[in-house]
Every structure is written in structure tokens, then in C-alpha cells.
């Protein structure tokens, strides 16, 4: 999904473009400060690979892939967005380690989810989070996510907790 811009109190969320993928972005995936909880960063990636990943998603109408900007500090992605079931699966990556644990998740998730609700009539947001990522689980619960044993997504890893948030 292209050309989306959402303003929050501290950030501008906007559709990613290939040019947003630079060495700094690559360090979020390959660097020593990468998050241990991001599946995509489990193997080394090249700039070419990451740009292709971004390009495919930005051009897919069932994906909302936004960068978190004041300066680019991370991304939030809804993939896939199922318009028939009025639900989306969310992932969040705070790439800049100095922005982790700064309470940006509620601001970013609420703004982008409400945009999906108001613009696309999405009513449910689902996610999977590593059971060891206690900070993220608490943050999601404060937003309104509930732990769910059965979701619209299949979770086969016993270390992943399924969570769901109703936007109604």
C-alpha cells in the first residue's frame, strides 16, 4: 500500500520506499544491536534483498508497511490485511536500540490500527510475540491486546504467544 502518511504526537508514519533501506536500516537486521525477537533478522541480509522485500510489500494492496520517522527508527507492518475477514496481522520492529523501551509502541500501533479501522474497516489486529519478550507482551496488553489460544493465524512455535485486539 503506497502513499500512506499518519501523524502521531511524536512521529510520522509513512509508506516505506526502497530508498529507505540503507546501511543503517541493514544494521537493524544484521548488526550487533538487532532485536533477537525479529524473525527476519535470523539470517544475514543484503541491501538488495531488503530493498526487494520492501518493494514487494509496498506494491501489495494487502500490506501496510510503514516506517516510523522523526528520523527512521523502525517499522510497523500489517501483513496480510484480510479485507473480507476485516483483520490484519501486525509486526513491529524498533530498529534503533536507543528507542526501544521508550513507550513508542502504543502511540504507533494505536495510530496505524485506527487508520486501518477508519480507512479500510479493519476490526481485528492479530500478532505473535516471543514468550520471552515480556516488555512487548506488557506493552501489547496495555494497548488492549488479549492473549488468545486460537487466532485467525496459525502459530506452530510453542515459544510464540498469540494476541488479538478488537478495534470496536
Tell what function each PLM region has:
Residues 141-151:
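Conserved acetyl-CoA-binding loop of GNAT-fold acetyltransferases
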Residues 88, 123, 130-137, 150-168:
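C-terminal "cap" of GNAT-fold acetyltransferases
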Residues 1-51:
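A short, well-structured alpha-helix characteristic of acyl/acetyltransferase catalytic modules
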Residues 120:
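Long, contiguous binding/interaction regions
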Residues 24-25, 90, 125:
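Hydrophobic pocket/interface hotspot
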Residues 101-115, 138-142:
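Conserved acetyl-CoA-binding loop-helix of GNAT-fold acetyltransferases
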Residues 43-98:
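Acetyl-CoA-dependent GNAT
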Residues 15, 80-82, 152:
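Short, low-complexity Ser/Thr-rich regulatory SLiMs
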Amino acid at each position: 500500500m503506497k502513499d500512506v502518511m499518519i501523524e502521531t504526537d511524536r512521529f510520522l508514519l509513512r509508506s516505506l520506499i526502497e530508498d529507505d533501506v540503507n546501511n543503517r536500516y541493514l544494521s537493524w537486521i544484521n548488526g550487533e544491536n538487532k532485536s533477537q525477537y525479529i524473525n527476519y533478522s535470523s539470517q544475514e541480509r543484503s541491501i538488495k534483498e531488503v530493498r526487494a522485500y520492501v518493494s514487494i510489500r509496498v506494491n501489495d494492496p494487502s500490506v501496510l508497511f510503514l516506517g516510523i520517522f522523526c528520523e527512521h527508527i523502525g517499522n510497523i507492518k500489517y501483513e496480510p490485511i484480510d479485507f473480507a475477514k476485516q483483520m490484519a496481522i501486525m509486526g513491529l520492529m524498533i530498529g534503533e536500540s536507543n528507542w526501544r523501551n521508550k513507550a513508542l509502541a502504543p502511540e504507533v500501533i494505536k495510530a496505524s490500527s485506527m487508520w486501518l479501522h477508519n480507512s479500510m474497516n479493519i476490526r481485528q489486529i492479530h500478532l505473535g510475540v516471543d514468550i520471552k519478550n515480556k516488555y512487548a507482551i506488557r506493552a501489547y496488553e496495555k494497548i488492549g491486546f488479549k492473549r488468545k489460544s486460537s487466532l485467525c493465524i496459525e502459530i506452530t512455535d510453542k515459544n510464540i504467544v498469540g494476541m488479538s485486539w478488537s478495534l470496536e
